[in-house]
């Protein structure tokens, strides 16, 4: 059955295939346009450089009027990412707009990696470290990057 949400997701997928933003990829799981797997590559010249981070995106029939549920499957250490992989990002909550597509969502998450908001922490330890001990924070991020190479 082709619903407005499914049509929009097909359009998002085609756009992502034909004009993929640098450092991100995503596709629906087999036979389920409402559930996507995605990968964000750590941006160059940052502590995240070289990392390969997996995410899942769960869309509802209310998409694009409501945002998907997005979470990292990969283990993360970041001020705005909860232990369960959920992401504290305004466009996934109160700043959502139907103009955002999958590419915009993933690009925003990639930007968040390098530009966290320690004033809205999902991980208080990472937020404190980011603000008070950047060297140790970067070391912990590098550990997560190395783990991303071997994680399933």
Swiss-Prot record:
Keywords: ATP-binding, Nucleotide-binding, Transferase, Ubl conjugation pathway. It is an enzyme of class 2 (transferase). CDD domains: UBCc_UBE2A_2B. Pathway: Protein modification; protein ubiquitination. The keyword Transmembrane does not apply. Its EC number is 2.3.2.23. GO terms for biological process: protein ubiquitination. It catalyses: S-ubiquitinyl-[E1 ubiquitin-activating enzyme]-L-cysteine + [E2 ubiquitin-conjugating enzyme]-L-cysteine = [E1 ubiquitin-activating enzyme]-L-cysteine + S-ubiquitinyl-[E2 ubiquitin-conjugating enzyme]-L-cysteine. The active site is at residue 88. GO terms for molecular function: ATP binding; ubiquitin conjugating enzyme activity. Disulfide bonds: none annotated. It comes from the Eukaryota. Residues 4-150 form the UBC core domain. Belongs to the ubiquitin-conjugating enzyme family. Catalyzes the covalent attachment of ubiquitin to other proteins. This is Ubiquitin-conjugating enzyme E2 2.
